[in-house]
Amino acid sequence: MPAISLGLWHNFGDTTLIENSRQLLQRAFDLGITHFDLANNYGPPPGSAERNFGRILQEDFLPWRDELIISTKAGYTMWEGPYGDWGSRKYLLASLDQSLKRTGL
């Protein structure tokens, strides 16, 4: 893992203009940052940071995809019901699948 990464918590949700997020990612990459950290609940609203990152990745970063390290996390409440939060196997697998879909990976 690189010594420095860019966390995308409150600066990549739907409350932020996508162009601001795009410029931030481009500048970070130009400065040598190749690790981008996400989580299933990053936004706001939850999940929107992964979705917006995925959009920018597809539109701007595909030629450099092999240079990027993209991480995400699970364990935070995402939906109602017995499998909607924390660490059950079912929750973690469902969360992983949803994160992969949102990011387009």
Regions found by a protein language model. Give the residues of each.
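N-terminal binding-site loop/beta-alpha segment at the start of enzyme catalytic domains
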Residues: 1-69
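Generic beta-strand or strand-like secondary-structure segments
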Residues: 52-56, 69, 73, 91-98
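Structural motif corresponding to the early beta-alpha repeats
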Residues: 60-87
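Glycine/proline-rich, positively charged
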Residues: 79-105
